[in-house]
Each structure stands twice: as structure tokens, then as C-alpha cells.
Amino acid sequence: MDNIKNHLFRQKRKSAIPCGQPVRWIAAILLLLSMICAGCSAKTEESPSNITSAHNWDDMAPVGSMDLLYADQFSVEDYGDDITLITIGESDRFLLLPENMSAPDGLPDSITVLQKPVKNIYLVATSAMDAFIRLNALDSIALSGTKESGWYLPEAKSAMEEGKIAYAGKYSAPDYEKILNSSCGLAVESTMIYHTPEVKEQLERLGIPVLVERSSYENHPLGRMEWIRLYGVLTGKEEEAEAIFKQNVDSLSDVLDMVPSGKTAAFFYVTNSGSVNVRKNGDYIAKMIALAGGTYVPENGGSDENA
């Protein structure tokens, strides 16, 4: 009887050993699967932030464009994947890419690459400053082509007084060393730069992209105002720019719908030398008077843009 008991006891012990093994194996397998799934999930989450460039320019095409109401001196095209092509005038093109994305293969040398949002701007075109102020994007400007005393906009003057924006020389004599040391991402020049093309060429040789602000060439007065939409794209504040532009257009809708009053108006200014300048009929001031329902005089002042 004792032998039978001992045999049964040994059998129970032998059967008890393998019984725990499947449990441990199942637990190990479940743990391994959970680790694999976690790894897959981590890789999926990380992939978007590691985008560099898998594009070839020849295979890329616009999927949409900014619907401009008045401006004709710039255009903005959407190429998908947060890639934007900006054209200024007839030939200056800029490809605005997400941060850390490299340029597409086969991109023509005539297209300048910018990384969004554009930072440490060297702002020479004074007419653009108001747009940056309204967009609350002064922090994207590091350098100014106008001295502190030359600004009539209090926000710009204060930024220079506080050292947030530094003077880097006027359009014809920029401080190249200061511009380079500031890691300048873009120089926004006025059309005066066309009188000193060697400066533009030198900036570009140093790797500083140059965008010439052509709002003064707009045929419609409200085309100038629409440039805020371009600066919204450059600074990553598209929604703010659209809202500001819409608000301004809406506020003028009643005026634009008015029947011409038949009243005449003249506009002139006195220069530092004491001479009197009269705006010509093709000037934006004359067109603004016409939009308001008036008639600009003198009517035989010519049709050129300048005074």
C-alpha cells in the first residue's frame, strides 16, 4: 500500500511540473506581443516628424492656389504636404518647405528654398512693417534697414529701443557681417534694390534669400493691402492674415458700392527741398480717390505710377 501511495505521489509531482510551464509560456508570448505592438506604435508616431524629402520636382504639381481678389504682383500655390510655391512679379520664385524638409530632387536653381516659418528677417521694405505688426509677427524680424528714429510706427520703434530688432544698414549699404551673424532667413527688400543690383547679388552669394516687395506696383489700391496674406504664409499666420484682410475688405464694401459723387480732389506734398509734387493719374492715391467716389485733379497729370 505504501508503495502505491509513493507512486501516486510521484505521479502527481511529475504532472504538476508541466502544468505551470504552459502558463509561463503564454505569459511570455503575450508580453513579447505587447512589446512588438508598442514598438510598431512608436514607429508610426515618429515617422511624420522625420520627414526629409521623398519628392522629385518633375513629379510635383500644384493642388490649389490662393484666390487673390486684388493683388497681381504675387501668387501662392499649394503643392501638398505643407509645401508652398510663392511667385513674386514675373520670375522670382520661392519654395516654402516645412521645417527640416530638404528641397525636392531636381529643383531648378532659379527657385529659392525657404523654411517655414521664416525667421530672423532683415526688413528693408518699410511698407511691409505694418503687416508684420498686425499679424503679431514682429518676433520674426531680427534686423531693420531703417534706423529707430526713422520709424513712425510705435511698435517698430519700441522693438528697436528694446533691442529686439537691430539696425543692419540701409538697402544700398547693408551690414553683411551683422546679417550673417543673425542667421538671417530672408531679406525683404523694397524695389529700391533694383538700383543697386550688386547688393542683392552679394546677399544671395552669402546664402541670404532676397524677396523684393512689389506692393507699390499693384494696379489696384487694395492690392497693396492684400500683401498681408503673403506675409501670413511666410510667418505661419495664414488664418490671422485671412481674417484681417476679410475684415478690411468688408469695412470698405459700402464705400466701394457708392455711386460716384462727382466731387473733385487734389493731392500733393512738399519735399524737403521745398518743391511741390503732384500725384499722377495712374498713381495709387488717385485711384483711391476714385474708389471713394471722387474725381482726381489735375486730370492731365499723366498716367505714370510715380508723382
Regions found by a protein language model. Give the residues of each.
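Bacterial N-terminal signal peptides that target proteins for export
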Residues: 4-26
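Bacterial N-terminal signal peptides
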Residues: 26-37
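Bacterial Sec-exported substrate-binding components of ABC uptake systems
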Residues: 40-129, 240-266
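A short, structured surface patch at a secondary-structure boundary
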Residues: 84-90, 94-180, 186-193
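Extracytoplasmic substrate-binding proteins
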Residues: 120, 164, 177, 181-275, ...
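Short, solvent-exposed loop/turn and secondary-structure capping segments
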Residues: 132-136, 199-200, 281
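Short, structured coil segments at secondary-structure junctions
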Residues: 137, 206-207, 292
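Alpha-helical, coiled-coil/dimerization segments enriched in small aliphatic residues
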Residues: 277-306
